[in-house]
Amino acid sequence: MKILIADDSSTVRRLVAARLSADGYQVLEAADGAEAVELARSGRPDLLVLDKVMPKMDGFEVVRALREDPRTASVPIVMLTERTSEQDVLGGLGLGVEEYMPKPFSPLELSLRVRRLLARAAP
C-alpha cells in the first residue's frame, strides 16, 4: 500500500516516513500543498497524511482539490497538524478528513490510525 505524506517540515516527513516504511508501506513525500495534489493524482496513494499549514496550498485547499477530483475523492486523509482549534478540527472534518491528529504526535498512534483507516477502506 502507498501513503503520501505532505508536510513542509522535512523532519516531520522523515519521522512519519520512517514509521510507515517500517510498517511495510511505500511512502511518497510532498513538501507543499501543490506538490501534494500533483502526487496524489499521479501516484494514486491509498492514504494521505497531511499538514494544515503548508506553502502554495494549505491542507484544507488540498483536501478540497482532492475531494473534487473523482480519481482522489475517496482517498482517506489523516490531518496531522499543530492547528487544533475547534474551528480547525471541525473545518477539516467537514471537508472530509477522516482523522485529525495534533502535533506533537505519537508515531505509534499514527501507525494504528493509518492501519485502521486502510482496513476500513479495503474492499
Where in the sequence are the language-model features?
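Charged docking surfaces used in two-component/phosphorelay signaling
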Residues: 14-22
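C-terminal output helix
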Residues: 105-115
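Short hydrophobic/Thr-rich beta-strand motif most characteristic of the beta2 strand and flanking loop
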Residues: 24-31, 39
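Active-site beta3 strand of CheY-like receiver
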Residues: 43-49
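Receiver (REC) domain active-site loop signature in two-component systems and cognate sites
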Residues: 54
